């Protein structure tokens, strides 16, 4: 039992979630609420990052489960939180704060794929908009020699204001310079490049050919190094494609195995059957249960080498795992004579010798709402006893 579930609720997972479930939840939420896509959801992005930072660390998670958020804040596991952007970059293959200072931002895109795509391999063309250095001004933003140091921030890109918060007490506030928008330099409007309007970069359409190899997994990243947004003075970042697998109507993937449920009739469970299965590469395989091989409800069997191809070893495959569900016939499907004949064919049932101490009871269909209705009626009855209701009386003349 955990002390509180706030972090689990933020990620939308249960307290017993596995690391894979935590990663999947963080990946989807972080991409959805990233400041680049949702500038107004900064606080939500921060909460998601903090929750994942704690729950993805075994020691911090144990501490949180026992003592809640307060235990984390008190520093029992190296308290305090990292930068949400650092967590995002490390998760998606970028790096920490120091790397972002030397390189442009990584651009992360989610690519929806089917289980068939991951089984057979596929190629997708993805059209993206990215920043590239303006070739008209070669990334200067204007004419040669037109760029000058911003006098307001002295080239730092930051302004420092002193704010008095009490007698003898001042607060130093650092903010982005409004004069140069944090660039540390400015260009006279008449000297600005007409192509980029002094921004040094322009938007350009980029077509990426994404190769999805056989056996790739949900959440796997495909990185295009140096294809991210360009910025003067910085090495271009990467474009990172994150595969997001859609649910399949028949199969569920479990590592290298494929799992499915199969309904069979009672006669098939007792007397054998043949069942066709359409595979993800459009083949049809036939599974056989021979007469005399009894299949019980909930039995799990498998077909070797019919699961998912193994990544980078596509000629090897996992297992196709099948769980069987038995469909029993409806009441009265046999006449009394045929039922008696069937009983003679089946293994003998055990008879119970009744004694005087035994009571005969009747089996009825279970109604899950019966207890709820009885509980509700009981409360209403008690309420009437403690608070008799005065009904509106009819007028008499």
From Swiss-Prot:
It is a lipid-anchor. GO terms for molecular function: ATP binding; ATPase activator activity; Hsp70 protein binding; protein-folding chaperone binding; unfolded protein binding; zinc ion binding. Residues 6-68 form the J domain. The modification Phosphotyrosine is found at residue 381. Residues 353-365 have a biased composition (Acidic residues). InterPro entries: DnaJ, DnaJ_C, DnaJ_domain, DnaJ_domain_CS, DNJA1/2-like, HSP40/DnaJ_pept-bd, HSP_DnaJ_Cys-rich_dom, HSP_DnaJ_Cys-rich_dom_sf. SUPFAM superfamilies: Chaperone J-domain (SSF46565), DnaJ/Hsp40 cysteine-rich domain (SSF57938), HSP40/DnaJ peptide-binding domain (SSF49493). The modification Cysteine methyl ester is found at residue 394. Zn(2+) 2 binds at residues 150, 153, 177, 180. The modification N6-acetyllysine is found at residue 66. CXXCXGXG motif repeats lie at residues 134-141, 150-157, 177-184, 193-200. It holds the Pfam family DnaJ_C. Residues 395-397 form a propeptide. A lipid is attached at residue 394 (S-farnesyl cysteine). Keywords: Acetylation, Chaperone, Cytoplasm, Endoplasmic reticulum, Lipoprotein, Membrane, Metal-binding, Methylation, Microsome, Mitochondrion, Nucleus, Phosphoprotein, Prenylation, Repeat, Zinc, Zinc-finger. The modification Phosphoserine is found at residues 83, 335. Zn(2+) 1 binds at residues 134, 137, 193, 196. Its main location: membrane. Residues 352-397 are annotated as: Disordered. A zinc finger (CR-type) spans 121-205. It is found in: Membrane; Cytoplasm; Microsome; Mitochondrion. It comes from the Eukaryota. Co-chaperone for HSPA8/Hsc70. Plays a role in protein transport into mitochondria via its role as co-chaperone. Functions as co-chaperone for HSPA1B and negatively regulates the translocation of BAX from the cytosol to mitochondria in response to cellular stress, thereby protecting cells against apoptosis. Stimulates ATP hydrolysis, but not the folding of unfolded proteins mediated by HSPA1A (in vitro). Promotes apoptosis in response to cellular stress mediated by exposure to anisomycin or UV. Identified in a complex with HSPA1B and BAX. Interacts with RNF207. This is DnaJ homolog subfamily A member 1. The lineage of its organism: Eukaryota, Metazoa, Chordata, Craniata, Vertebrata.
């Amino acid at each position: 039992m955990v002390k509180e579930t706030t972090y689990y609720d933020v990620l939308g997972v249960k307290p017993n979630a596995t690391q894979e479930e935590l990663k999947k939840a963080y990946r989807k939420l972080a991409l959805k609420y990233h400041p680049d896509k949702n500038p107004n959801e900064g606080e939500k992005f921060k909460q998601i990052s903090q929750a994942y930072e704690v729950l993805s660390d075994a020691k911090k998670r144990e501490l949180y489960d026992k003592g809640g958020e307060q235990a984390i804040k008190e520093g029992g596991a190296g308290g305090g939180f990292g930068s949400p952007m650092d967590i995002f970059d490390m998760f998606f293959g970028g790096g920490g704060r120091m790397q972002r200072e030397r390189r442009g931002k990584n651009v992360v895109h989610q690519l929806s794929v089917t289980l068939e795509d991951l089984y057979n391999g596929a190629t997708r063309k993805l059209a993206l908009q990215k920043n590239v250095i303006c070739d008209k001004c070669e990334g200067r933003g204007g004419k040669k020699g037109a760029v000058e140091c911003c006098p307001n921030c002295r080239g730092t890109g930051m302004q420092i204001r002193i704010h008095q918060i009490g007698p003898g007490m001042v607060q130093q506030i650092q903010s982005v310079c409004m004069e140069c928008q944090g660039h540390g330099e400015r260009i006279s409007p008449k000297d600005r490049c007409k192509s980029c309007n002094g921004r040094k970069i322009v938007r350009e359409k980029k077509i990426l050919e994404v190769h999805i190899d056989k056996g790739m997994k949900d959440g796997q990243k495909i990185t295009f190094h140096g294809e991210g947004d360009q910025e003067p003075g910085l090495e271009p970042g990467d474009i990172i494609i994150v595969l997001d697998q859609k649910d399949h109507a028949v199969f569920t993937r479990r590592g290298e195995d494929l799992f499915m449920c199969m309904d069979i009739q009672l006669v098939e469970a007792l007397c054998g059957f043949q069942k066709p299965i359409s595979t993800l590469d459009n083949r049809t395989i036939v599974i056989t249960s021979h007469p005399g091989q009894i299949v019980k409800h909930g039995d799990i069997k498998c077909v070797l080498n019919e699961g998912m191809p193994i990544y980078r070893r596509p000629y090897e495959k996992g297992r196709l795992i099948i769980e069987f569900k038995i469909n029993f016939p409806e009441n009265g499907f046999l006449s009394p004579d045929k039922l008696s004949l069937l009983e003679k064919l089946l293994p003998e049932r055990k008879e119970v010798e009744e004694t005087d101490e035994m009571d005969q009871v009747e089996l009825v269909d279970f109604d899950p709402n019966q207890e709820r209705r009885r509980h509700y009626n009981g409360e209403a009855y008690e309420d009437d006893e403690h608070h008799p209701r005065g009904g509106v009386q009819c007028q008499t003349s």
